Amino acid sequence: MTKFEFIKYKTNKKIRVLFKNPKSDIFVVFLHGLKSDLTGKKPNYLMKQCKKRKVGFMGLEYSGHGKSYGKFETGTITSWSNDVKFIIKQKLINKKIIIIGSSLGAWLGLIQLKYFKNIIGFIGIGAAPEFLD
């Protein structure tokens, strides 16, 4: 059975996180797509592959997604990116990270590259970034 934890973020807000094999030096961070969560086929497949290879796995549900706090309608790329940044700082600051992002998750993963030097790899699945800024 998969055990999730909730990490307190800001005042009375919690982000749902799945964290496996905490002793690993390398972590796959899965970032799901818009209106998705961590119960789908992609995160479950990746988690199994990580376990098989003794690599850490982490996924999170951004605000308004899955069982995390908030309403989807109030979320923005910035707020969801900040959710990801906060959790990486809490859990993986001294670990090597490979980000695998699906759709919106790929966009959020690309944004993290400017914040973390310990990201050693990136895979975008159906990436949907917007480069107008």
Model regions: which residues?
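The serine-hydrolase catalytic nucleophile loop
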Residues: 35-47
